[in-house]
């Protein structure tokens, strides 16, 4: 921009020297506001050049006056003009050099440095208010289903109820570090929020105090990652924008757990991920729909994922193999669980403001990977047989985002999940069988990092007995990201 302004000055000065009226002389170059000490130094040098321009203007005025009074010849006036033009050329060269030097200056670091380590603190403050109508029952106080969409907590078999709640529990904080070591970056990341901890009894009575809950914590070096992170079986970056904690939870893979993951770039936008992740088996008995946590797993879950990205799209396909295991009291069983997932994000339209996002997954014995355990991995009941009966699952969601303007946008989404229980053993009456939802929202970002949104969602839950429940929710959110 500085060079363009100076070229304009040069042209005007040369024209003025050859007889243009004084009214056409350009104004002094405006100084850009410095944003750093380096920019301040460059600005000072630019001001000195502007002073030289002012001297040149004075010389030109004297040349015109001399020509008008007959005290100098036309040759003298032309000589003065040439001298002024030469000065302008020299100034242009000097300013161009300054611009090049500024362009080559390193970008300001994101975060701050302590010793040889870069530190970054970030997150967001999110405030949510909602009005919910449950068509077939009511939730107990402190239930997470009051605060975000959790299909397994939609009541069934009761009278309709209405619930109003406001909170800031989805507020999130993280800090990360990066240290150069042997030509690679050694990184650490710790993240927590307040969303998934059970609300203390009486929390809303006065102070609304909530316990922080650990989300992610890992170290990475080069292509190796060790720690608690989103499962390799999904890509959380593909989830659609929503006022809700997740959005289409009923169709989502949703797991964070300990893992050892290795990423191998293959070129042309392809990456291969291989991971061994923390195992956990969730079961029901033939008479109770309460989830049983079994901690007798003997092998990690193994995941492989192939991911592709370019300027307008991101796609992945992943496979999961695991050992479903229950042992104790001299009894127990193992079974092979497996599944696959596909997902993606495709941007289109002016400035890529619109996008289509989707994910689908299916498998046997992988129920805990869907919707925070909407359905179990298996049914296990020692009173019937010392055997695991695996449950089949299919789930998916899709969304369409429309960017109406640079600051106004909407997302429309749908989610679905179905669990198929084995026929050879009884299924509890309240075991979750199916869930689906539809939602639409409108988001407005009046300034950078500040979002306001409103969303409507209709959802249905069905259980093995044939009972069903509905949920209708209008939710508003304000979010400041830092």
Placement of each model-derived feature along the sequence:
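Extracytoplasmic loops and strand-loop junctions of Gram-negative outer membrane beta-barrel proteins
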Residues: 104-107, 153-160, 242-246, 287-290, ...
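Transmembrane beta-strand segments that form the barrel wall of outer-membrane beta-barrel proteins
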Residues: 187-196, 278, 317-323, 413-418, ...
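Detector for outer-membrane/organellar transmembrane beta-barrel domains
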Residues: 310-432
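Outer membrane beta-barrel
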Residues: 107-145, 151-282, 296-314, 345-351, ...
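N-terminal periplasmic/intermembrane-space "pro-region" immediately following the signal or transit peptide
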Residues: 29-138
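Outer-membrane beta-barrel "beta-signal"
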Residues: 444, 470-482
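Gram-negative bacterial Sec-dependent N-terminal signal peptides
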Residues: 2-29
């Amino acid at each position: 921009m500085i060079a363009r302004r100076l070229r304009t000055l040069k042209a005007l000065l040369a024209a003025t020297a050859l007889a243009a009226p004084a009214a056409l002389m350009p104004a002094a170059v405006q100084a850009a506001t410095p944003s750093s000490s380096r920019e301040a130094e460059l600005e000072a040098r630019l001001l000195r050049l502007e002073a030289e321009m002012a001297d040149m203007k004075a010389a030109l005025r004297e040349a015109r006056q001399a020509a008008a009074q007959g005290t100098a010849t036309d040759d003298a006036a032309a000589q003065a003009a040439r001298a002024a033009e030469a000065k302008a050329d020299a100034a242009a060269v000097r300013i161009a050099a300054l611009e090049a030097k500024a362009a080559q200056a390193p970008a300001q670091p994101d975060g701050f440095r302590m010793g040889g380590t870069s530190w970054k603190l970030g997150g967001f403050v999110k405030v949510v208010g909602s009005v919910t109508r449950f068509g077939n029952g009511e939730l107990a106080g402190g239930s997470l289903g009051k605060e975000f969409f959790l299909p397994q907590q939609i009541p069934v078999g009761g009278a309709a109820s209405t619930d109003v709640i406001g909170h800031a529990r989805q507020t999130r904080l993280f800090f990360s570090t990066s240290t150069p070591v042997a030509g690679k970056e050694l990184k650490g990341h710790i993240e927590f929020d307040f969303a998934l901890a059970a609300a203390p009894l009486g929390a809303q009575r006065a102070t609304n105090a909530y316990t922080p809950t650990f989300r992610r914590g890992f170290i990475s070096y080069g292509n190796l990652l060790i720690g608690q992170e989103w499962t390799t079986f999904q890509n959380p970056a593909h989830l659609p924008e929503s006022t809700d904690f997740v959005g289409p939870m009923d169709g989502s893979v949703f797991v964070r757990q300990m893992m050892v993951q290795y990423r191998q770039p293959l070129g042309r936008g392809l990456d291969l991920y291989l991971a061994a992740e923390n195992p956990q088996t969730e079961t029901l008995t033939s008479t109770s729909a309460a989830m049983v946590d079994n901690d007798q797993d003997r092998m990690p879950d193994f995941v492989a994922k192939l991911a592709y990205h370019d300027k307008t799209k991101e796609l992945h396909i992943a496979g999961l193999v695991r050992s479903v295991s229950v042992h104790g009291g001299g009894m127990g069983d193992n079974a092979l669980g497996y599944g696959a997932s596909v997902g993606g994000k495709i941007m289109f339209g002016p400035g890529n403001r619109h996008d289509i996002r989707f994910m689908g997954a299916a498998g046997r014995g992988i129920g805990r990977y869907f919707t925070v355990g909407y359905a179990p991995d298996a049914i296990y009941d020692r009173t019937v047989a010392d055997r695991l009966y695996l449950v089949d699952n299919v789930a998916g969601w899709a969304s369409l985002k429309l960017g109406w303007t640079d600051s106004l946008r909407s997302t429309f989404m749908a989610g679905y999940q179905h669990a198929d229980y084995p026929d050879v053993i009884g299924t509890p009456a309240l075991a979750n069988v199916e869930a689906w939802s539809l939602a639409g929202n409108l988001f407005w970002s009046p300034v950078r990092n500040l979002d306001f949104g409103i969303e409507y969602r209709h959802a249905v839950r069905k259980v093995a007995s044939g009972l069903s429940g509905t949920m209708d929710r209008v939710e508003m959110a304000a979010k400041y990201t830092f």
